């Protein structure tokens, strides 16, 4: 930390603590012209290497998005929405496409540095917003990784028990977990072992981990295609009538549930520093992986609801039991293999993204510099990667993290909403920078206020919908959001991004719709998730006040691009 000592020792010499906190919290990264080619280096002098092609990026996004849920969630939602679950996935997919358009623009604008939503919000807004986004995302990632590893352990045990010699002989602490101290603790050995193996793979290098992800993702995609093709011959179109037996509200509610089945395409944005041609490939990878996922989910929905009447679908393993009822038990075995492959890739990519986020904050000084170190020969953020594996391993090994699932998704929705807001804010900054050097212009402030109003309207509409309030209140909330969006559209001028990268169409309307729907979904989460958002935000602010503001590296405020060509160093 020696490089920051001089800065830290003088932190209170020129201003009060509050003024220093305010100045630090509100500073942001600058975005130089696209011609800047300054390389990003770690504290050890080494950098990541560019080894991911377009196909690797698409498989990365698909690997992160499609887990075991494709075999379970489809049937669970179909029990309420009926065959209309297809529309639920279509609506949720359309919403994710809008979010993906925002990610695609920003990944094209920041094509050479890791950080994703954290980096975008640091440049569009300020330092403390970026830190809060990171903390909310990271809590989701850590708990999610632990939960997925436990699910993977359970599926792996179930797959092993298909062999008669092993059936019933595998102890609980290897699979679902053995409860101790009245359920306060839940011992699981296999989950940390699986996490250790995947962490080891990720530490070996991006080429090796990408190869593992590609093989496992291809396996599960092939299995899903086999399921769709085999099931297509068993479809009875009479099962699709009535298409929405419980009305459109059940279909819409289903869309709010299945939305999270698409989460993962944003992982592509965090591979910016390891992509061979980031400005071209990142937007295509984000959109391409999402479209693949939408197609697969809709295909599974049509097959599942066509094979079995929705009212007879099983809650635990709907797809497997649907094929078993048709005498195709071999497909059920394939589904188990596909579930293991799906959970493996979801976990692998999740751990990968976590380490790159830690790397970004370590470089900026918001976390200890050890997180910014890159191994000189493996070219991976070794310390960050091992730390992510340890945190997930401890959580998965001794806690029943499944009980925390109801407070997840807060970070994801927060990240998506902030990214959409970043598109608008950066476009405003572009216009402002060309006309004035004053960052805090009234035009920029008015734009941010409109974004906040849209977010509040989305939350209000979500709460009214959740508690079945009069439709008038929902319409009023929508009306307020429409007015705020209209103000953004007619009173603001937006400059296209500098350079020849991808530009999100329909700005500011598309980002506004994203923010409204994301916060609408936020309102559907368990009330404890709302409490978690507030508590974590307060704690994160305290950590920033005590550590971040003093250790953030001012020299990193100038955005620096990594080399734009592949390196095999």
Swiss-Prot record:
GO molecular function, one term: transmembrane transporter activity
The UniProt record lists the keyword Metal-binding: no
TM region(s), chain numbering: 53-73, 81-101, 113-135, 155-175, 181-201, 215-235, 250-270, 284-304, 333-353, 406-428, 444-464, 467-487, 502-522, 528-548
Alphabetized InterPro entries for the sequence: AA/rel_permease1, CAT_C
Tissue expr: Expressed in roots, stems, flowers, and leaves.
Mode of membrane association: Multi-pass membrane protein
Transit peptide, UniProt annotation: 1-41
Keyword Chloroplast found: yes
Gene Ontology BP annotations: amino acid transport
Coiled-coil regions listed in the entry: none
Pfam families named in the record: AA_permease_2, AA_permease_C
Superkingdom of this protein's organism: Eukaryota
Subcellular location: Plastid, Chloroplast membrane
Gene3D superfamilies per record: Amino acid/polyamine transporter I (1.20.1740.10)
Keywords: Amino-acid transport, Chloroplast, Membrane, Plastid, Transit peptide, Transmembrane, Transmembrane helix, Transport
GO cellular component terms, semicolon-separated: chloroplast membrane; plant-type vacuole
Homology family: Belongs to the amino acid-polyamine-organocation (APC) superfamily. Cationic amino acid transporter (CAT) (TC 2.A.3.3) family.
Function: Permease involved in the transport of the cationic amino acids.
Protein name: Cationic amino acid transporter 9, chloroplastic
Species the sequence originates in: Arabidopsis thaliana
